[in-house]
């Protein structure tokens, strides 16, 4: 069947291949790069390959060979090995699905592929460096930093949060019927933990994570200053491309340097900070196991676990509270259990 719209072609490919939501998203990224690189629609690229096949074009003159090789050369200059291999594999799978015979493609020579340096614990931003970054960041970037440090959310998942996420996730504390009054309450308190129900972008699976008290209080104060009371407005204003630019600019200004070819102060490193410090951040107090951190990051359980074990947000919150001092920049936390409820006790460092 011939299609004139890329989306129809792609939908047919995914439907008949039985791809998961995560696979569909990763294919979308590769298809967009392939189309943009060749400045052609996917329909036209496929039609070109089919025409050559029907015309029995000699293998050494096939355009599809040049297209795949030139695209791979582009990826080699801009990406690391696994990304290159996975991207080319997806393009070849797409052609194969549409019954296009692909000529022999020489294997990738690993000597010419960039390799990221392995990131060690010492490469992570320290708490002192993060406090310094907070001094120089504007209000919007401060919120981004604290949200990712405390929740471990990816940029996309953090960006998906709205003011309603904060309002509803702290309702058990403020018990207000409007966001303005809730913010006034939250701005005064230093012991409120926000429960966030998010969707993991890679898998479309819901999961729970949390914002620690210093993050909640700082956001509340900024929102009050900005008079930002629309519940459906984004919690974090910068778009993803701009926030990357802001992090890079601040990283370079503070001289934090790079590791693995990337700035040390960047969202993904803050996620690593969250994971590492929750599991290994202290010789004192409580730490979380890797399985618990995986739950807080939305990383999936296997299918059997997923079928039988459901996440209890109150239990996850209790586990998080016990360990959240490890990812806090300004305060340390203890807790009491009063009448079956966990009460957080906040103390300055």
Question: Residues of each region from the PLM?
Answer:
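A short, basic/aromatic helix-end/turn motif that makes direct DNA contacts
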Residues: 160-170, 281-302, 307-314
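C-terminal catalytic core of Y-nucleophile DNA break-rejoin enzymes
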Residues: 195, 200-221, 229-251, 266
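C-terminal secondary-structure termini that scaffold catalytic or DNA-interacting sites
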Residues: 315-349
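N-terminal core-binding DNA-recognition domain of tyrosine recombinases/integrases
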Residues: 8-118
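Conserved tyrosine-mediated DNA breakage-rejoining catalytic core shared by Y-recombinases
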Residues: 161-218
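Short, basic (Lys/Arg/His-rich) helix/loop patches that form interaction surfaces
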Residues: 227-233, 245-302
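Basic, Lys/Arg- and aromatic-enriched nucleic-acid-binding interface segment
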Residues: 127-156
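DNA breakage-rejoining catalytic core of tyrosine-based enzymes
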Residues: 113-131, 192, 202-214, 228-231
């Amino acid at each position: 069947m011939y299609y004139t719209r890329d989306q129809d072609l792609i939908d047919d490919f995914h439907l008949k291949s039985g791809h998961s939501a995560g696979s569909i998203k990763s294919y979308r990224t590769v298809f967009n790069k392939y189309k943009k690189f060749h400045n052609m629609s996917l329909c036209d690229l496929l039609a070109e390959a089919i025409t050559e096949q029907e015309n029995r074009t000699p293998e050494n003159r096939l355009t599809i060979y040049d297209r795949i090789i030139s695209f791979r050369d582009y990826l080699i200059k801009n990406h690391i090995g696994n990304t290159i291999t996975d991207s080319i594999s997806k393009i070849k799978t797409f052609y194969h699905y549409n019954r296009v015979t692909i000529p022999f493609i020489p294997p990738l020579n690993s000597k010419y592929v960039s390799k990221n340096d392995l990131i060690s614990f010492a490469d992570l931003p320290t708490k002192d460096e993060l406090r310094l970054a907070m001094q120089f960041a504007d209000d919007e970037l401060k919120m981004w930093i604290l949200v990712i440090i405390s929740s471990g959310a990816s940029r996309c998942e953090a960006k998906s949060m709205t003011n309603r996420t904060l309002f509803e996730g702290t309702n058990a504390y403020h018990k207000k019927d409007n966001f303005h009054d809730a913010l006034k309450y939250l701005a005064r308190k230093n012991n409120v933990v926000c429960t966030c129900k998010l969707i993991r972008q890679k898998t479309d699976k819901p999961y729970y994570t949390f914002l620690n008290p210093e993050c909640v209080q700082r956001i509340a104060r900024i929102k009050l200053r900005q008079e930002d009371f629309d519940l459906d407005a984004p919690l974090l204003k910068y778009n993803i491309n701009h926030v990357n630019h802001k992090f890079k600019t601040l990283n370079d200004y503070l001289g934090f340097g790079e590791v693995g070819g990337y700035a040390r102060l960047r969202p993904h490193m803050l996620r690593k900070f969250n994971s590492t410090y929750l599991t290994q951040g202290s010789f004192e107090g409580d730490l979380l196991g890797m399985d618990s951190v995986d739950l807080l990051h939305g990383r999936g359980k296997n299918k059997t676990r997923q079928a039988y074990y459901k996440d209890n947000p109150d239990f996850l919150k209790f586990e998080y509270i016990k360990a959240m001092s490890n990812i806090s920049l300004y305060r340390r936390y203890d807790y009491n259990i009063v009448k079956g409820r966990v009460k957080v006790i906040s103390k300055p460092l």
